[in-house]
Design a protein with these regions (language model features):
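Extreme N-terminal segment that seeds HTH/winged-HTH DNA-binding domains in transcriptional regulators
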Residues: 1-34, 39-43
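N-terminal helix-turn-helix
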Residues: 33-66
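Minor-groove-contacting beta-hairpin "wing" of winged helix-turn-helix DNA-binding domains
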Residues: 36, 70-75
């Protein structure tokens, strides 16, 4: 199911907020493995490049870490 987005703000920024809220709420627990970029993008109804940008921002903020062969994990 696609999410609804506010057209006045960048979609990637809204994704960052939503993913951050899920991390802080425990939906994605520390050490938990995140779904693939494609799966997360499909669930949100966005382009994978947009989701990649959101995940890169979360990584820059220290909330997510990327393991080259294993994917992304919540820190």
């Amino acid at each position: 199911m696609s999410e609804q987005f506010d057209a006045s703000r960048p979609i990637y920024a809204q994704l960052v907020e939503r993913l951050k809220a899920k991390i802080l709420a425990g939906t994605y627990p520390p050490g938990g493995h995140l779904d693939s970029v494609r799966d997360l993008a499909a669930a949100a109804g966005v382009n994978p490049n947009t989701m990649q940008r959101a995940l890169a921002q979360l990584e820059a903020e220290g909330l997510v870490r990327t393991e080259r062969t294993d994917g992304r994990f919540v820190t």
